[in-house]
Amino acid sequence: MGPKHFLNFEKISNQEFVSIIERGIELKNSNETEKTLKGKILGLVFEQPSTRTRVSFEVGINNLGGSSIFLSGSELQLSRGEPISDTAKVLSSMLDVIVLRTDNHEKLEIFSQNSSVPVINGLTNLFHPCQIMADLMTFREVTEGKNLEKVCWIGDGNNVCNSYIEAAKLLNFELSIFCPKGYEPNANILESSKKFVSLATNKEDALRLSLIHI
C-alpha cells in the first residue's frame, strides 16, 4: 500500500475531514504542543510564490518538532528539463512529506504517483484544499462546532472555488456561486457536485445566503 496523499477532497471521508479540523483546533489551543513529528523533514517545493501557505507549513512542522526545507522552482532541475517523475523519486527518498505548489494540477498528480512519501497540495490551478481546511476550521471555531449549512461564493470560479465545490459534497452543505459569465468554475467539478451546488448570475440570489466568502 502506497503513501496517502492529500491532493483534493476526492479521497478523504467526512469523518477524516472533521477529525483533522478538530485536531487542528486542539493543537492551536494547546499550551504545550506535542512533538509528534520530531525528526521528520518536510519538503516545500514551490513553483509558485507564497506567503501564508509557506509560513503556515513552516511554523506547523517546527511546532510539532520537525524541520523543513524550501525549494523554489528556479532551484529545481525541473527548470532544466528534468522530468517531474524523477524529481519526485529523488526528493521522496530523502524527505518524509512533501508540499507541492504548482501551476498545473497534472504535475501534482504525476509527482504524487512517483513519490514514496505523502504529498500535499499546496495549490494548483485546479484546487487549493488547504485553504478550505483553514476556512472551515475557522468557521467551526467561531460557531463552537456548528455544522455548516450554507455558503455563498462571490467571485471568479478559481481553484479555491473548485475546492469549496468538493467540500460541499463532502460535508453536505449548500453552496451558491455568484460568478460572472466566462469565469465559471471547472465544469466537470461542478457536475460531480451538482446536487449541492447552484451557479447564480445575479447578485440578488447570492445575497440571500447566510455566509459570504469573497
Task: Map each language-model feature to its residues.
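Phosphate/diphosphate ligand-binding glycine-rich loop within oxidoreductases
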Residues: 31, 35-140
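Glycine-rich phosphate/diphosphate-binding loop of Rossmann-like nucleotide-binding domains
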Residues: 47-59, 144-197, 201-209
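Conserved small/polar residues in nucleotide/adenosyl-binding loops
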Residues: 212-214
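Conserved beta-strand segments of alpha/beta enzyme cores
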Residues: 5, 67, 118, 174, ...
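An anion/phosphate-binding loop that grips the pyrophosphate of nucleotide cofactors and donors
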Residues: 95, 209-210
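Residue-level preference for short coil/turn positions at secondary-structure junctions
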Residues: 2, 37-38, 115, 147, ...
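Short gly/ser/thr-rich secondary-structure transition/capping motifs
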Residues: 23-29, 81, 194-201
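Positively charged, low-complexity intrinsically disordered leader regions
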Residues: 1-55
